[in-house]
Design a protein with these regions (language model features):
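Active-site neighborhoods and metal-handling regions in enzymes and metal-associated proteins
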Residues: 1-314
């Protein structure tokens, strides 16, 4: 049995249910190894697994099913009717569903049709399962990260005075694609000068000038898995104050890395970095969390913020 389906059947059994139904694109990818824009996956507690698709995805689903073992079903008239047939066939009485991502309208339509089935909230349990990556997932994430890093180093040759943020951001996306990225993890953030104070700023027609910081926030994807990197460089001659700020942020980053270990609270890792900044009264400018988990989603699982109750696990 495909490892991710095996893990899912254990979750179903632990929750005392008969099956789980998945609509979320990332959750479906976790099971079927690609990202259809629409579809339904049902997995039973015994491991019977179904992937319901429309004709746009039948061939792709069948190719991936050779690895996953999913039974591919092409809809005849509606997803709901196909789901109803499977629920009756498998005698599903308690069905886990994605209560945090499904729309109210979709829930109501399924609950009305499957009126003899109890819907049980999945909550965070599926994401908690996804948090722990299998070896093959780690390799895919490494590949995405390597593509992003290689592309960044290539882009540096093009970062020159007079180039605009938009121009370089577009070039960056092209270089990542050329190096094997399936797409960007998120809209590339490339900012210069005073714009670098905005953690999620949007590239503009602003040109790079001598003495600027240039901020890069970017990621590549590979077979559905994301990477996320942030880098800052200086152009030409910069002030002593800018050098001090750069060194302070680097020191804070290294303190966070040192504190990062299995069993450590995410909030404590954040605090380790914050304390370094606050030594120079710069903590008030730390407006963003220290970091977050990545995977099939760009923000997945852990969040290293002061309010997080999570602990890092191996």
């Amino acid at each position: 049995m495909y490892i991710n389906i095996e893990k899912t059947t254990k979750l179903i059994q632990e929750k005392g249910c008969d099956a789980v139904i998945l609509f979320n694109e990332s959750n479906m990818h976790y099971i079927c190894s690609f990202s259809p824009s629409e579809g339904v996956i049902i997995i039973t507690k015994s491991g019977n697994s179904y992937h319901i698709v429309d004709s746009r995805y039948t061939e792709t689903a069948q190719i991936h099913a050779q690895k996953t073992g999913l039974k591919v079903i092409e809809i005849k008239n509606s997803f709901l009717n196909e789901v109803n047939d499977i629920v009756n066939k498998e005698n599903i009485k308690r069905l886990l569903f994605e209560n945090e991502t499904i729309s109210l309208a979709q829930y109501n339509s399924y609950a009305k049709k499957l009126n003899n089935t109890e819907f049980v909230e999945l909550n965070h349990d599926f994401m908690l399962m996804r948090n722990k990556k299998e070896a093959f997932e780690i390799e895919l994430m490494k590949k995405a990260n390597n593509i992003a890093e290689k592309s960044f180093l290539e882009l540096l040759n093009e970062v020159k005075i007079g180039k605009t943020e938009k121009e370089l951001a577009a070039l960056f996306d092209y270089i990542m694609a050329r190096n094997g990225s399936d797409g960007v993890s998120f809209d590339t953030i490339l900012l210069t000068g005073t714009h670098t104070s905005m953690p999620h700023g949007v590239p503009s027609d602003k040109k790079i000038k001598d003495g600027d910081f240039v901020l890069f926030d970017f990621g590549a994807t590979y077979q559905g898995y994301h990477s996320d990197m942030t880098r800052t460089i200086a152009i030409g001659n910069i002030t002593d104050e800018m050098k001090e700020a750069y060194d302070l942020v680097l020191k804070a980053q290294l303190a966070g890395i040192k504190a990062l270990k299995a069993g450590e609270k995410c909030a404590d890792v954040y605090q380790a970095a914050y304390d370094v900044l606050n030594e120079k009264d710069m903590g008030k400018y730390f407006r963003h969390s220290l970091g977050h988990g990545v995977g099939l989603d760009i923000h997945e699982g852990y969040n290293a913020s002061p309010k997080s109750n999570d602990k890092f696990e191996v």
